[in-house]
């Protein structure tokens, strides 16, 4: 059943909008790429504003959009229009994948985002978000307002990354976002699967680099 009232979700959304991130502001100004804030907030209302004990934050959507946009811009500057392959672990409701899809769309660059999660894409369920107040939905239904981006850029895969990633064919992974399991062993496994298919200049972005909460991620990255 829904975890909160509509009023509570809207209150949380209003509060998280007030957060400021000077380092991300500087990053956006330095690169010249920044996601449309209103677009981001609307997507987050349906995919990131949830009931949980830890503080709400979806600033990683800004980082992903800017990092991928800069990567695309640098490739386009060398006249490379090669179709990009992007991997994401930890789809959840689809927020991060859509932020990356928006970067591809805004820079008019071909690419495919393969996103992996244990949660099914086409099974009706509650998602701990404001949409639960309507009725249980599949992820596909939850993301219907952004269905054009989903159709053009995103492929959803269900399963444990330890079992699924080795079976997925990809000669090269240009860009990756790791937000799946947060143990050192799992992060290193995903990293090893990706780095073997990357070339100099390709990127991996890690979520939740916080020593107190996720020391395994910090250890893997460092």
Language-model features: where?
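N-terminal auxiliary segments of SAM/dcSAM-dependent transferases
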Residues: 1-31
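Generic detection of intrinsically disordered/low-complexity segments and helix-coil linkers/edges
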Residues: 3, 33, 200-203
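Short alpha-helical hairpin
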Residues: 25-45
């Amino acid at each position: 059943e829904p975890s909160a009232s509509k009023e509570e979700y809207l209150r949380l959304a209003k509060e998280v909008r007030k957060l400021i991130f000077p380092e991300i502001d500087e990053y956006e100004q330095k690169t010249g790429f920044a996601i449309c804030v209103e677009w981001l907030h609307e997507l987050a209302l349906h995919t990131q504003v949830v009931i949980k004990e830890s503080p709400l934050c979806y600033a990683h959507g800004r980082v992903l959009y800017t990092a991928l946009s800069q990567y695309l811009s640098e490739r386009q500057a060398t006249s490379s229009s090669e179709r990009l392959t992007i991997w994401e672990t930890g789809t959840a409701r689809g927020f991060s994948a859509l932020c990356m899809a928006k970067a591809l769309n805004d820079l008019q660059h071909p690419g495919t985002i393969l996103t992996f999660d244990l949660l099914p894409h086409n099974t009706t369920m509650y998602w701990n978000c404001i949409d639960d107040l309507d009725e249980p939905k599949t992820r596909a239904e939850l993301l219907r307002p952004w269905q054009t981006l989903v159709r053009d850029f995103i492929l959803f895969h269900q399963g444990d990354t330890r079992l699924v990633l080795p079976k997925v064919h990809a000669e090269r992974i240009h860009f990756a976002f790791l937000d799946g399991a947060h143990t050192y062993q799992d992060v290193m496994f995903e990293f090893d699967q990706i780095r073997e298919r990357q070339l100099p200049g390709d990127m991996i972005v890690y979520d939740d680099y916080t020593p107190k909460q996720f020391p395994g991620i910090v250890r893997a990255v460092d």
